C-alpha cells in the first residue's frame, strides 16, 4: 500500500516568505529552508524581522490571498490522487496554508500552527512534532504504508531518504550536487512518471 508524501512550498505553491518579502519590500525575508537547514533558527529570525517592522499575521495573509498554485500543480495533484493516496507535509502553518489548500482542491495537509496575539502579532510557533516530515513518513511506514516522497529543500531530505522512493523536485543546484544519488526532476510530468514507476 503506497502513500505519496509531498512538500508544499516550492513544489505545489510559490514560497510564501519570498512572496511576502517582495510585497513588503524586506529582502531579508527571502531566506528559506533552501538556504537555512535549521527551521527553528529560520522561523525565530523571521519573527524577529516581523516584530522589528511591526508586521503581523494580517499582512502576511493579505499576500497569501494573492498567491496561486504553481502552473500545473492542481492538475498534477488531481492526477496523482487517481492512483495514490497523497498527504502534503509542510513546515508551514494552518493560518498560512488554508487559502492555498482551497485552490488545490482541499488535499490532506499535515503542518504546524502559529501563536498569534490578539493584535495580530505572531508571537511564536508550535511545531506538530520534531522533524515533522521524517517523523510522519516513519509513522506511516509503521502502520503498513510504503512511502514515496518528494520535495525541494534541505528539510525534505529526511523523508526522501527514508522512503521506498524519493525524488527532488525543482531543487537547488547545491542540493542536487550534494545528493547526486537522489533523482531530480523539473516538471510535473517527469515527477508523475517517476511516482507511477515506483508504484508498479
State where each predicted segment sits.
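Alpha-helical segments flanking ligand/cofactor-binding loops in enzyme cores
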Residues: 78, 138, 157-158
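Substrate-recognition "cap/lid" segment bordering the active-site pocket of phosphatases
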Residues: 95-147
Amino acid at each position: 500500500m503506497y502513500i505519496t508524501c509531498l512538500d508544499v512550498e516550492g513544489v505545489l505553491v510559490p514560497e510564501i516568505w519570498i512572496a511576502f518579502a517582495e510585497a513588503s519590500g524586506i529582502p531579508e525575508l527571502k531566506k528559506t529552508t533552501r538556504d537555512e537547514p535549521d527551521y527553528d533558527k529560520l522561523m525565530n529570525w523571521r519573527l524577529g524581522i516581523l516584530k522589528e517592522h511591526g508586521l503581523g499575521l494580517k499582512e502576511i495573509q493579505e499576500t497569501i490571498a494573492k498567491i496561486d498554485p504553481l502552473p500545473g500543480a492542481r492538475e498534477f495533484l488531481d492526477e496523482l490522487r487517481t492512483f495514490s493516496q497523497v498527504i502534503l507535509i509542510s513546515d508551514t502553518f494552518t493560518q498560512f496554508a488554508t487559502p492555498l489548500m482551497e485552490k488545490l482542491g482541499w488535499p490532506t495537509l499535515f503542518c504546524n500552527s502559529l501563536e498569534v496575539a490578539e493584535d495580530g502579532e505572531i508571537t511564536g510557533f508550535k511545531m506538530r512534532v520534531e522533524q515533522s516530515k521524517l517523523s510522519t513518513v516513519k509513522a506511516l511506514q509503521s502502520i503498513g504504508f510504503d512511502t514515496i516522497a518528494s520535495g525541494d529543500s534541505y528539510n525534505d531530505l529526511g523523508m526522501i531518504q527514508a522512503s521506498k522512493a524519493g525524488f527532488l523536485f525543482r531543487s537547488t543546484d547545491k542540493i542536487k550536487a550534494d545528493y547526486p544519488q537522489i533523482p531530480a526532476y523539473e516538471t510535473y510530468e517527469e515527477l508523475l512518471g517517476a511516482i507511477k514507476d515506483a508504484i508498479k
